């Protein structure tokens, strides 16, 4: 496969993100990561829900699916199961993925389906004028709120680990190269992967600004004693506990980097193939013919009756 440069993953679609938006850094990291991994655009799918972050598929020259609010992971699940050979990456905001879409977020972790999720975490609903998202802490009042937030915050790292994700990381949108390296590792990981990407919202969030993060963030990999990788099943509980404890750090010091990796767990598509002989990762449903050469369906009326014979009820007139 010929090597592709970063420019080949860019589109000519104009971005209407606010100047200074953290989404620009995430987009740049994705394009650079795709180029360094030399991903085939025809075999790569970027999926999103609704929100500022969910415009991302329009700006990357791969297959893009811009779906409905909170359902990006649900669509990505269908895409991956239909063709496990694809690289599938989900982009969504903290409101999109951890609010209305949180059930799908948890389900993806439980399944350990080989999909990568990027959470654009700016702690507000930017597209709808700055309401508090699930990651804004109780008592905090960003400039778009008339009163302080009444609800406690979701910790994306802790939730991901509890849900079963086997690659869990946090990054910062303005540290583009650091995010790029984490994203490459997440895409190469076999299993469900999530990156909680902290980012400023210059329009509505006057608390979590670039200035706020500048002197607080530190990289986990700078600590030589930090080892998030599970190399034996007996280590799993200890690694998870350490990751959750580290994820609770917030305030004067905020860790970014890889919190937890378990490469030992089989994926959902592998388990599905073992249980269902008709499901094949090498010959997935998306690549199987749905009609004969003459255009007629492979499963005609006679075959249909044979397959579903035990479900057919013959009703006799009295």
Curated annotation (Swiss-Prot):
Pfam families linked: PFO_beta_C, TPP_enzyme_C
Amino acids binding [4Fe-4S] cluster: 18, 21, 52, 201
Documented EC number(s): 1.2.7.11
One Gene Ontology MF term: 2-oxobutyrate synthase activity
Cofactor note: Binds 1 [4Fe-4S] cluster per subunit.
Keyword Magnesium: yes
InterPro entries: 2-oxoacid:Fd_oxidored_beta, 2-oxoacid:Fd_oxidoreductase, OFOB, PFO_beta_C, THDP-binding, TPP_enzyme_TPP-bd
Source organism superkingdom: Archaea
Needed cofactors: [4Fe-4S] cluster; thiamine diphosphate; Mg(2+)
Keyword Ligase recorded: no
Binding sites annotated in the UniProt record for thiamine diphosphate: 50-53, 69, 95-96, 126-127
Keyword set, alphabetical order: Iron, Iron-sulfur, Magnesium, Metal-binding, Oxidoreductase, Thiamine pyrophosphate
Sites marked Plays an important role in the binding of CoA: 129
Catalytic activity annotation: a 2-oxocarboxylate + 2 oxidized [2Fe-2S]-[ferredoxin] + CoA = an acyl-CoA + 2 reduced [2Fe-2S]-[ferredoxin] + CO2 + H(+)
pH-activity profile: Optimum pH is 8.
Thermal dependence of catalysis: Optimum temperature is 105 degrees Celsius.
Positions of Mg(2+) binding: 94, 122, 124
Subunit structure: Heterodimer composed of an alpha and a beta subunit.
Biological role stated in the UniProt entry: Catalyzes the coenzyme A-dependent oxidative decarboxylation of different 2-oxoacids such as pyruvate, 2-oxobutyrate and glyoxylate to form their CoA derivatives.
Name used for this protein in its record: 2-oxoacid:ferredoxin oxidoreductase 1, subunit beta
